From Swiss-Prot:
Zn(2+) binds at residues 39, 98, 101. Belongs to the beta-class carbonic anhydrase family. Forms only homooctamers in solution. It catalyses: carbon disulfide + 2 H2O = 2 hydrogen sulfide + CO2 + 2 H(+). Pathway: Sulfur metabolism; hydrogen sulfide biosynthesis. This is Carbon disulfide hydrolase. Keywords: Hydrolase, Metal-binding, Zinc. Catalyzes the conversion of carbon disulfide into hydrogen sulfide and carbon dioxide, with carbonyl sulfide as an intermediate. Likely plays a key role in sulfur metabolism that allows A.thiooxidans S1p to grow on carbon disulfide as the main carbon and energy source. Does not show carbonic anhydrase activity (hydration of CO(2) to carbonate). Its EC number is 3.13.1.5. The lineage of its organism: Bacteria, Pseudomonadati, Pseudomonadota, Acidithiobacillia, Acidithiobacillales. It comes from Acidithiobacillus thiooxidans. Binds 1 zinc ion per subunit. InterPro entries: Carbonic_anhydrase (IPR001765), Carbonic_anhydrase_sf (IPR036874). Its cofactor is Zn(2+).
Length: 217
């Protein structure tokens, strides 16, 4: 039987490893070698949806988790995925989007119009003040916002974007899922509305007029 000193030494070492695990590169990966991209919405409980533990050091550590509006592919999502897949031992990417998403609730062209009325020049925006080289082409702002016409279609496009991106290794497993907030059910994305427990996964219930800029088509 080990002494208490030995047990405590191992216990402290485990916390040191936890705190410094990024220093180990691929050998310091998270518990499941997993990177999760999810919508930032508070109605999407990543741990419950995926059956893993992400959020707390006490019971977490299963994945790196990146959340943004919509859980969509963006330049910073690609940057984070590139780092975790190439340098931190990640072997799998899981994308989680959800029904009743706020990214369905408005038309991006109208949203840009509102910003212009507030005096913002959306044709001359520095996306990252520390990287002024990163610029949007004139007229691309509404598309950049990333509003959706259909959650399932967007989820499938996001999956393909990561599968085909040159900065993501080809052996990375990529999958995407839709969380139905109405009944707390996870399912695969589908264009067959008969296979959706809910069919109001489009902007129609919000009264959105006109299609979004063609980012996801």
């Amino acid at each position: 039987m080990s002494t208490l000193k030995e047990q405590l030494t191992a216990h402290v070492a485990s916390y040191d490893h936890w705190a410094q695990r990024r220093r180990y590169g691929p050998d310091g990966h998270n518990n499941r070698s997993l990177w999760v991209l999810a919508c930032m919405d508070e109605r999407l409980p990543v741990d419950e949806a995926l059956g893993i533990h992400v959020d707390t050091p006490a019971g977490g550590g299963d994945a790196h988790c990146f959340r943004n509006a919509g859980g969509i592919v963006t330049d910073d999502a690609i940057r984070s995925a590139m780092l975790t897949c190439n340098f931190f031992g990640t072997k799998e990417i899981v994308i989680v989007q959800h029904t009743q998403c706020g990214m369905l609730s408005g038309n991006a062209n109208e949203m840009e119009k509102v910003l212009r009325e507030k005096g913002m020049d959306t044709d001359n925006i520095t996306l990252d003040p520390t990287l002024p080289e990163l610029q949007l082409a004139k007229g691309a702002f509404a598309k950049w916002i990333g509003m959706m016409d259909d959650v399932d279609e967007t989820c499938m496009k996001t999956i393909n974007a990561f599968k085909n991106h040159p900065l993501i290794p080809k052996d990375i497993v990529v999958s995407g899922w839709v969380w139905e907030v109405e009944n707390r059910r996870l399912r695969a994305p589908t264009l067959d509305k008969e296979k959706r427990a809910r069919t109001d996964c489009t902007p129609t219930p919000y009264g959105v007029k006109g299609n979004q800029p063609p980012r996801w088509k």
